[in-house]
Curated annotation (Swiss-Prot):
PROSITE patterns: OCEL (PS51980). Residues 164-219, 237-284 are annotated as: Disordered. One of its GO terms (molecular function) is cis-regulatory region sequence-specific DNA binding. GO terms for cellular component: cell junction; chromosome; cytosol; nuclear speck; nucleolus; nucleoplasm; nucleus; transcription elongation factor complex. Testis specific. Residues 269-281 have a biased composition (Low complexity). Residues 168-178 have a biased composition (Polar residues). This is RNA polymerase II elongation factor ELL3.
Amino acid sequence: MEELQEPLRGQLRLCFTQAARTSLLLLRLNDAALRALQECQRQQVRPVIAFQGHRGYLRLPGPGWSCLFSFIVSQCCQEGAGGSLDLVCQRFLRSGPNSLHCLGSLRERLIIWAAMDSIPAPSSVQGHNLTEDARHPESWQNTGGYSEGDAVSQPQMALEEVSVSDPLASNQGQSLPGSSREHMAQWEVRSQTHVPNREPVQALPSSASRKRLDKKRSVPVATVELEEKRFRTLPLVPSPLQGLTNQDLQEGEDWEQEDEDMDPRLEHSSSVQEDSESPSPEDIPDYLLQYRAIHSAEQQHAYEQDFETDYAEYRILHARVGTASQRFIELGAEIKRVRRGTPEYKVLEDKIIQEYKKFRKQYPSYREEKRRCEYLHQKLSHIKGLILEFEEKNRGS
């Protein structure tokens, strides 16, 4: 994806007419964000927007409530060599023929999604729950839920970007204008041709797909069975906790303290290695005592069965812990790029605190599952190494 030529700065405002110093964006948002914008329009309050590169946050304040949303700005995909995406409006006139007006080309796309619960919404919209889509960790990374194929079904509006010195222009803007749907209609006009044979992005083959591919190849049956066995029992994905440091989690002292107290298994510094004293039995992981070198095919089969049992649990924990860890790593990296004391820093700080509080309530067993996931990763790696070592010896003999 191409980089935007220059960063967007200024005040975000809904508009349906051309004006000087404006940029047209394709706005895509879910139902929760749309309801929040409508409530903000009804309350006649000024939204606050903070850009950080091509990402940012949108705060919709109100009397006694506040909503915080995340957004990302990207290039609009153009179909064909000369394809373009234009914003066209139709004016319905009482007298005379209706007219079409091209407001301009849509080069950037701004995707907004509900990122968290903030302060409870006013009673007029409590029944709709402004951030209903953000109650589960699976919805935190929601950008992938929008694609070019569903562009027509998503609400689309023209956005006016007024150049000002402060990216958080909360005092120089105007309130959201009234709804213009009864006066205008908008369409996406895709010029040039449509690519009919576009292939979807292919993911890495799974174990089942590899089995099917192996069966189709003209290889000996023994080789096929060996490959099926290998993919079924020995595919170990990397741990999601590798490279995770306490500095990546900017908020949550309890979380950080818990990480500091974790036992760094199988990691020995030079000072420890130089120590002549041997480690006590309680310091040695149980799987090192239980799983020794393999000397028979029966022992190998037993190890593989244990591997399959623990691997099923590891896959579940890996998905849960990895999603949660990655979210706070990204937030920590974003706040590091902002200078402390600025409005952007305050917006990010509030977002991290609120998301962490909500995360602790929704996922109280995170620490235990994180430890268990790390333990299983080390255990499965150990068993896998023993099996490969035994097979290598047999292959050589």
